[in-house]
Amino acid sequence: VLTERAAAEPMLGQVILWSQTNSGSENLAGLEVMSALLADAFSALPGELRLVEPASVTRVDAEGREVGVAHGRHLHLVVRPEAPLQLLLTGHMDTVYPASHPFQLPRWLDDGRLNGPGVADMKGGLAVMLAALKAHEQQSAALTFGYEVVINSDEEVGSASSAPLIAAAARGKTAALTYEPSALPDGTLAGARPGSGNFSFTVRGRSAHAGRNPEDGRNAVIAAALLALRLEELRRPGLSVNVARLDGGSPNNVVPDLAVLRVNLRPRTPELEQQASQAIASLVEGVARE
């Protein structure tokens, strides 16, 4: 019965409408439209719904400066917080496609497949989540548990501005479900994902003339490259390391005094996360001494 009720919901129309709305992670205007569409759709559920301002976030630019980063608002719905059993349902409204990207509108590939920005990842999942919750609310057993829904606007760029909201919503929950598509061809549900950390290392050296006094310089690009190689050596089963980008350099006749190295690490366990953090601190200290 629940499946039939969920199937009767207008999921396809919602996905098409939402996919037509560009909500790239940096498109604040588009995210505001998308959050309003979602708030309107999820207002069909009981409870208290609000759009939450993003937490303050900074990033390191190519000049090694810490600058603020703007993000969209996040949707937060709380239903029956007094119930003894509590669940968390999460998703994201942003996509990887900026407003300038040519991939903007959904289209049918054949009678059964719709292709469009965010259709799978994960506006389709949001429609499924909403349909399931609306179907659940129609049965008498609905009162036996409460739940929170968090739909963030920055998942594709690391969820930094929504992390406090997600962490708070997760406390005291019996289980949590995220409505992204399965990573496996047969549709098997994933029980866990590795953690993910994005690191920016600002390396400051000492400038000098490459012809007159190169021995007085400390080459920041070389130091950053050395750090990149040593970070790469941390890779092991359960811990992936991706050295993603190196910003830096100067005219050919000047020893560069600044470089910014960007790295992503993904540990599968908290123990590997702690080991990686300790190793990173040790490697940074070692390169700084050389």
Outline where the language-model segments fall.
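Metal-dependent amide/peptide-bond hydrolase catalytic core
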Residues: 1-3, 13, 20-23, 39-48, ...
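Acidic/His- and Gly-rich active-site-bordering loop/insert found
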Residues: 2-117, 138
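Solvent-exposed alpha-helices and their adjacent loops that cap or buttress functional pockets
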Residues: 80-82, 107, 121, 141-142, ...
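Short coil/turn connectors at secondary-structure junctions
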Residues: 83-87, 103, 110-111, 143-147, ...
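Residue-level marker for buried hydrophobic side chains located in beta-strands
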Residues: 87-89, 177, 206
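Acidic-glycine-rich active-site phosphate/pyrophosphate-binding loop
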Residues: 94-110, 173, 177, 190-202
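Glycine/serine-rich anion-binding loops at beta->alpha junctions
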Residues: 112-127, 209
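Acidic/histidine-rich catalytic neighborhood of metal-dependent amide-processing enzymes
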Residues: 122-194, 243
